[in-house]
């Protein structure tokens, strides 16, 4: 009788372990394309992304760098005070997107240019994404709003 209980207990533990491994595997598989790492221009200069890697780039849109093409293609440069990355985006920019303001773009590198598939801009004149604020503070160029 004890042997049967022990055998049943082991079967339950093995089944639970297999279910746990399957669940973790399915979660990892589901997130494989949904996790985009954030990088500042300085981080990209120090550790370039792998070819084809999708990631988020954030910083300030450099003054005087915004060029609107004849179509919906826009080019500009993003900086964090330490490094600058050229960006190309085809699509409609958010209404609050402008030079000297914070932005985060999702995309990948093509040569030396970051090709964005999505651009996010600040919410109001005082908002800045936390990642951008942290990287600007790290570079020593962050200024408090209204200062």
Swiss-Prot record:
Q: Name one GO molecular function term.
A: metal ion binding
> What's a single GO CC term here?
plasma membrane
Q: Which Gene3D superfamilies does this chain map to? A: Nucleic acid-binding proteins
* Cytoplasmic membrane side: 1-9
List the ranges whose topology is Periplasmic: 31-147
Give the highest taxon in the source lineage.
Bacteria
The protein's job, in short, is: Heme chaperone required for the biogenesis of c-type cytochromes. Transiently binds heme delivered by CcmC and transfers the heme to apo-cytochromes in a process facilitated by CcmF and CcmH.
Q: Which HAMAP family match?
A: CcmE
NCBIfam families per UniProt: PRK13254.1-1, PRK13254.1-5
Q: Which family, according to the similarity comment? A: Belongs to the CcmE/CycJ family.
What protein name does the entry list?
Answer: Cytochrome c-type biogenesis protein CcmE
Q: What's the gene?
A: ccmE
């Amino acid at each position: 009788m004890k042997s049967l209980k022990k055998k049943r207990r082991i079967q339950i533990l093995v089944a639970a372990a297999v279910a746990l491994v399957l669940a973790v595997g399915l979660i990892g598989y589901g997130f494989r394309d949904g996790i985009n790492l954030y990088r500042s221009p300085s981080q990209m200069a120090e550790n370039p992304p792998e070819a084809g890697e999708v990631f988020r780039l954030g910083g300030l849109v450099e003054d005087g760098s915004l060029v609107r093409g004849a179509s919906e293609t826009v080019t500009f440069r993003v900086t964090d005070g330490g490094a600058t990355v050229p960006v190309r985006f085809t699509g409609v920019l958010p209404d609050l997107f402008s030079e000297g303001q914070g932005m985060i773009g999702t995309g990948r590198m093509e040569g030396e240019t970051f090709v964005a598939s999505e651009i996010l801009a600040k919410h109001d004149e005082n908002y800045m994404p936390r990642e951008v604020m942290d990287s600007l503070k790290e570079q020593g160029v962050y200024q408090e709003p209204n200062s």
